[in-house]
């Protein structure tokens, strides 16, 4: 009986871990809203937020943007490609 309960608990925990892992893989692409999920932007991107005033009420709007490090890597790669040609 204890073995059966242990097996069921392990099965449930495994399903929870796998479903959490699948959710983590679905990242938010560039220029999409990340207001409610700020830590799930795709690698090389970060959630940047701006305070806007629409119709007299202040609202925070966030979007996934390329990080400064990702921009520098992209620019460096282009410069190296130019000099190799």
Curated annotation (Swiss-Prot):
It comes from the Eukaryota. Residues 1-19 form the signal peptide. The keyword RNA-binding does not apply. Contains 4 disulfide bonds. Residues 20-25 form a propeptide. It is found in: Secreted. A motif (Processing quadruplet motif) lies at residues 22-25. InterPro entries: Spider_toxin_CSTX_knottin. Disulfide bonds join 27-42, 34-47, 41-64, 49-62. Pfam families: Toxin_35. Keywords: Disulfide bond, Knottin, Neurotoxin, Secreted, Signal, Toxin. One of its GO terms (cellular component) is extracellular region. GO terms for molecular function: toxin activity. Expressed by the venom gland. Insect toxin. Causes paralysis in larvae of C.vicina by depolarizing membranes at the neuromuscular junction. The C-terminal part (65-85) forms an alpha-helix which probably disrupts target membranes. The presence of a 'disulfide through disulfide knot' structurally defines this protein as a knottin. Belongs to the neurotoxin 19 (CSTX) family. This is Latartoxin-1a. The lineage of its organism: Eukaryota, Metazoa, Ecdysozoa, Arthropoda, Chelicerata.
